Curated annotation (Swiss-Prot):
Species annotation: Brucella suis biovar 1 (strain 1330)
Physiological role: Component of an amino-acid transport system.
Top-rank taxon, per record: Bacteria
Stored CDD domains: PBP1_ABC_ligand_binding-like (cd06340)
Signal peptide per UniProt: 1-26
Similarity remark: Belongs to the leucine-binding protein family.
Gene Ontology biological process terms in this record: amino acid transport
Keyword Plastid: no
InterPro entries (UniProt xref): BCAA_transport (IPR051010), Leu-bd (IPR028081), Leu_Ile_Val-bd (IPR000709), Peripla_BP_I (IPR028082)
Name listed for the protein in its UniProt record: Leu/Ile/Val-binding protein homolog 8
Keyword annotations from UniProtKB, A to Z: Amino-acid transport, Signal, Transport
Amino acid sequence: MRLSRLLIGASLGVALSSTAFTAALADVKFGSLYPISGSLALLGEESARGLELAVDEVNAAGGIKGEKVVLERGDAVDNNQATGEARRLISLVGVKAIFGTYSSARVIAASQVSELAGIPYFEMGAVADEVTGRGLQYLFRTNPTAENMAKDSVDMLIKGIAPGLGKDPKDMKIGIIYEDSSYGTSVAGHQEDNAKAAGLTVVLKSGYPSNTVDMSSLVLELREKGADVVMQTSYQNDSVLFLQQANEAGYKPLAIIGGGGGYSMQPTADAVGHDLIDGVFDADYTQYAVNTSATPGLTEFVEAYKAKYGSQPRSGHSLTNYVGAKAIFQALNAGEGFEPDQIVSAVKALDIPDGQTAAGYGVKFGKNNQNERATMMGMQWQDGKLVTVYPENAAIAKMRFKK
């Protein structure tokens, strides 16, 4: 009897070990590399939530090629740590690909590591030209770019804001200010180029460190130059600082156009007050107050977000990362496997038409592995909410102008 029990126990142990081993084989590990601490943590965490929701969705549907997706997280608090975390995820954890990263500077640093290792890197939030401009073989970007953001800023000024103010856009003076990392520099450069190509007047283009604690001299310079339109590309803290110090100085340009970042965040509006931010424009990723006929799946995304995190999404960064990750997962599910070249082949074959994602744009990788169908939208803060006002097919409100 005792021997029988031992044999049964041994057999059961082998069976359980075999099951555990099989389960381990049925997991595919991906890296999730975002700034989740430090000055970029708020938008980094918001971006990571989109990836997490895409993973939840694909796992609920049976995983990718029958394998459960497991996210291994890394904290890209600065460029050095982004590089170190990429090495750890690849060498020690053994991830098949890395997803991230929100910050242009962080992904530029980290993707050098993945490229040398031959591991695919999917960027779903950083906009700087240099992200894809280096011609890396294993880096793909699903989201819109700095050029998209700049073009939408200028187009919105010419086609909507200037007519709404009763102005000829060529009579308006534009001041371009920006945080001086790869993100802000790229957007500002394209804004200047687009404005000048359209015959508009740029009276100031000036960068500053994103961690600045005083923008009063920049406010004064804008005022002295007579800038009646300000385009600012910024993170949250510098968005708040500029709006507050411009208000304190009594500087009231006819229009402020944010370039995503802090201008797309509800916490920014709450920090400066709804009376102050109302009327401010923003060119950025698809947000939530939008015509949902142009963004199929957006309502379901918001419901899933609220169920998991207990609040409304804080910006469109989570949505953009969700859409990007979901598209990549779709490609991998149709692919041959998880070896680097198999992953690259699968995503290069991806072809999602416009109007079939929750962000509204399609996905197809073109030159330098950039999603050539990615686009941005134009929003305005109205009654404390960021609502879509441009383009017309996605708008749910008309532009408002203060008298």
